[in-house]
């Protein structure tokens, strides 16, 4: 049982690092929403479980997630948990290891008789040097509108 909302992010990372879709899905209410880093949206615990089972089998089976920073805002029986993460060990479609990723996971938790569970989650990648994306013929292009500083850095 999750006794404090702060523990939601810790339990998510633990389930992720164990590559355990059942433990991860159990952190959510039956009707929870989860939006992943590319905008795929699962609308219940079973969908969240299935998506993560697939991810652990095909993409993230060797991955390791680390919490870098966390902020919790309690709103009575509800809390918003924002957690910055880093991830290593992801595999390419060819099965080769790829570089480190970073992102932010936002969990909205609600306290119930069985402790805290997430009712909603949104996960997003952090893309260094990018402010937004611009839609073009080939899809979305990472874009930065800021003026380069001296030396070409933004």
Task: Map each language-model feature to its residues.
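A short hydrophobic beta-strand element
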Residues: 77-89
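Low-complexity, intrinsically disordered terminal/linker segments enriched in charged
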Residues: 111-112, 118-154
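Short, cysteine-centered beta-strand-loop-beta hairpins and adjacent loop/turn segments enriched
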Residues: 88-99
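A solvent-exposed, acidic/Ser-Thr-rich amphipathic alpha-helical stretch
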Residues: 2-3, 21-75, 84
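Short, surface-exposed coil-to-beta transition loops
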Residues: 65-67, 82-84, 99-105
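Short, low-complexity N-terminal intrinsically disordered segments enriched in polar/charged residues
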Residues: 1-30, 137-154
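A short, structured loop/turn motif at beta-sheet edges
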Residues: 72-80, 109-117
């Amino acid at each position: 049982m999750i006794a404090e909302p702060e523990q939601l992010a810790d339990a998510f990372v633990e389930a992720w690092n164990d590559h355990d879709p059942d433990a991860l899905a159990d952190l959510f209410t039956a009707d929870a929403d989860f939006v992943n880093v590319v905008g795929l949206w699962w609308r219940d615990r079973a969908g969240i479980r299935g998506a993560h089972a697939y991810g652990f089998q095909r993409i993230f089976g060797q991955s390791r997630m680390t919490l870098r920073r966390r902020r919790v805002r309690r709103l009575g029986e509800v809390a918003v948990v924002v957690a910055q993460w880093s991830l290593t060990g992801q595999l390419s479609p060819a099965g080769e290891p790829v570089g480190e990723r970073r992102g932010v996971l936002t969990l909205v938790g609600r306290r119930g008789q069985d402790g805290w569970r997430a009712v909603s989650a949104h996960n997003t990648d952090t893309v260094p040097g990018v402010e937004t994306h611009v839609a073009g013929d080939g899809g979305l292009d990472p874009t930065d509108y800021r003026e380069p500083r001296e030396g070409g850095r933004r």
